[in-house]
Amino acid sequence: MKSYTEYLTFNVPARMDFINITRQVEEIVRKSGVQEGLVLCNAMHITASVFINDDEPGLHEDYKKWLEELAPFDPSPQRYKHNRTGEDNADAHHKRQIMGREVVVAITGGKLDFGPWEQIFYGEFDGRRKKRVLVKIIGE
């Protein structure tokens, strides 16, 4: 069994956004040479996420609205105790918790083995600085 690792780096100018990283992950799988195995993609920051969903703009807007309703941005220390530490991003931690840290996708015949409409996304909830995503491939 072999393994292969790469890191993707993002510096998203918006506070919250979703970026389709499927093509980048497909290219990393191709470079790995793995034909049968698994790829793990995980956000290496506690205010970012990697998740699988449909690449439909209306759905993305729905997610942003829903997440903002569940955990509204409020930098004051009144709403979130975390912000009493001098931080202003407690909402981003909650949004990441909802959307998840990582995804694992099967590699079959050297390709990502998705269901219909599935795509891999990087979710940013506290943007404007560099963050990384680990892409780890294991298999044969």
Residue ranges, per PLM feature:
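Active-site histidine-anchored catalytic micro-motif
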Residues: M1-E140
